Design a protein with these regions (language model features):
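PP2C/PPM-type serine/threonine phosphatase catalytic domain
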Residues: 1-264
């Protein structure tokens, strides 16, 4: 009888205010670290992490009030509860796993809504892109338009569904093109009429898998294939720094957060 594969994780994080924003409204849960002081630039790496582990990034909605507070509220709650989630996932059947993730999303949503209510703001919101690693599997859970990629053998696939609305515009110079609209769901939304459609994906881990979580401050400027090339060519922290530099060189109009996890 074969035993469990003993994977370890190496993780690297970079978060930057970008060139245009007045504050860094992105946040994250990375080990014990969240951006509690909303620093303009954060870099951190964690090596040789034993399973289970969980990581997340949050992109506060700049179009709504208190976007930075919303992402921080979600990051703090995620950081405080993710170990309990990992414990519950152990030996849970498929139905129970879905219930665990659904409970987490609604709890995060309620925390953001409560914060907004206390601040007397009608609406505040944030995205979520998260990874939960058990001994042999990864679970992707996301809300909003922050992306999760899997790079395997040089190929890159986005492995989460984006809750982003798109609009087709007809430009007389550029022709028809698709542009981003708002979000169809996010943490902080009113669920009294419409609830969440859960975006969950389960993946069997393999050695040398590379996961990348990022806010749209990266993907607005850097193509998927470029992300794959850089993470395959460069090591943990060098790759996220290079990707950040690319986004900044091409405008850096939004906050940029990149979280890379290597399966070893």
């Amino acid at each position: 009888m074969f035993g469990l594969k003993k994977y370890k994780l190496n993780a690297g994080l970079i978060s930057d205010i970008g060139n245009k924003r007045l504050e860094n409204q992105d946040n994250f849960s990375f080990g014990k670290l969240v951006n509690a002081d909303r620093q303009e630039h954060v870099e951190q790496e964690l090596r040789g992490q034993k399973l289970p582990q969980a990581y997340a990034i949050m992109d506060g909605m700049g179009g709504e009030k208190l976007g930075a507070q919303a992402s921080l509220e979600a990051a703090g709650f995620f950081s405080s509860i993710h170990k309990d989630i990992l414990t519950e996932l152990d030996n849970a059947d498929q139905k129970r796993k879905e219930e665990i993730f659904e409970d987490l999303i609604y709890s995060l949503n309620e925390r953001v809504r409560k914060m907004a209510s206390e601040q007397k703001v009608r609406l505040s919101g944030t995205t979520l892109a998260s990874l939960f690693f058990t001994e042999e599997k990864a679970y992707v859970l996301s809300v909003g338009d922050s992306e999760v990629f899997l790079v395997k053998s040089g190929n890159i696939d986005r492995i989460n569904k984006l809750d982003a609305l798109t609009i087709t515009v007809d430009d007389e110079n550029l022709g028809k093109r698709t542009v981003k609209g708002g979000l169809s769901q996010f943490l902080g939304m009113d669920t009294s009429e419409y609830g969440f459609h859960l975006n969950i994906k389960e993946i069997e881990l393999e050695k040398d898998d590379i996961f990348v979580l990022c806010s749209d401050g990266l993907t607005d400027h850097v193509e998927d294939v470029e992300i794959a090339l850089k993470v395959c060519e460069y090591g943990l922290m060098d790759s996220v720094r290079i990707l950040l530099d690319l986004a900044l060189e091409r405008g850096g109009k939004d906050n940029i957060t990149i979280l890379r996890v290597d399966v070893d």
